[in-house]
Amino acid sequence: MELDRSAGWVVAFVGGRFSWEVVFVEGDVLVLVEGKEVLADGVVGLTLRAVGEDGLPSWEPGAHIDLVLGDGLIRQYSLCGDPRDAGTWRIGVLKEGPGSTFVHERVQVGDRLTARGPRNHFLLKEAPRYLFLAGGIGVTPILSMVAAAEAAGAEWRLLYGGRRRSAMAFLDELSVYGERVEIRPQDEFGLLDLEGALREVTSGTLVYCCGPEPMLAAAEECCGALGVGGLRTERFSPKAVEGVDEAFDVELALSGRTLRIEAGRSILETVEKAGVNVLSSCREGTCGTCETPVLDGEPDHRDSVLTEEERADGGFMMICVSRARGSRLVLEL
């Protein structure tokens, strides 16, 4: 791993599955809530500007940030503004759970918040064609993707579903794209016809899907049944996994220490207790912050970040949730 600590930021370039791309820009940045608006029923948007003259780190479509909220809450939100705007970040927040409730009810224009990132495990890859599938607040990372696809001159289509039209954010912004955006509220059209959309996918098309877990599971099932490759998903909640927790050993290659990971305790918890500092955030396998190189052994992947190809490669794992398939792992820690 190379670290560039210029300008107070830590930029990590990790060889392997990211092919030496920027994986994340990590550091605390103080942001001012410059704007707050209602985007839809139960959804508010925040516009954030850096406090001071340093500005905000750059980002690409698919990226998210952490917001440090009250009562020790840290939540991840997809950036949904224009990556070319170096002065502000924009996020959309669905009122669901204590973190988003805090944003809806207590965060006001003029407040200062701590943000971290951005990070991107849902990066928009270059392709001639795209199919975007969005459900509910899952449209937030997709919004900047369709703008990027349009700017690149690629063919694309967006299928966007929600419970009802009044609860679907960004409809006015998306209307400028005409028939390439299909708005399908459930109370008017029923469930999204994922199978129909995926049957039309041609070779070279990348499929990006973000939404509630049942929708993501259905998309994965349809792609498997139809033989559609190129599916990339992002989850806002942990993916259901099956497996029995058993104890195993982890060797920390940088220090030579070996730690016992007991059943019911994560690798992350164990190494933190042993005094090893590891970047982490969600602690449920959805954000990718704790991604760690695997030097030996076979991981039991339980995260919602890695693709099937990346899991099969076995070179990285999310140590907040994933475990070992055998009795021992060697990690670059």
Please name every model-derived segment:
Residues G15-R112, R116, K125, G162-R164:
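Ferredoxin-reductase
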Residues D187-F189, E262, R323-L333:
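Short flanking/linker segments adjacent to small metal-binding domains or redox-active Cys/His motifs
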Residues I65-L67, F248-A253, C290:
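Short polybasic amphipathic segments
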Residues A63, C80-R84, A263-L268, L306-E308, ...:
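A short, sequence-level motif marking secondary-structure junctions
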Residues H64, D111-R112, K273, T289, ...:
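Residue-level marker of beta-strand positions
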Residues E246-L279:
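C-terminal accessory/binding modules appended to enzymatic or scaffolding proteins
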Residues P141, V276-D303, R311-G326:
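Local cysteine-cluster metal-coordination motifs and their immediate loop/turn environment
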Residues E2-G15, S100-L254, R260:
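FNR/FR-type flavoprotein reductase catalytic core
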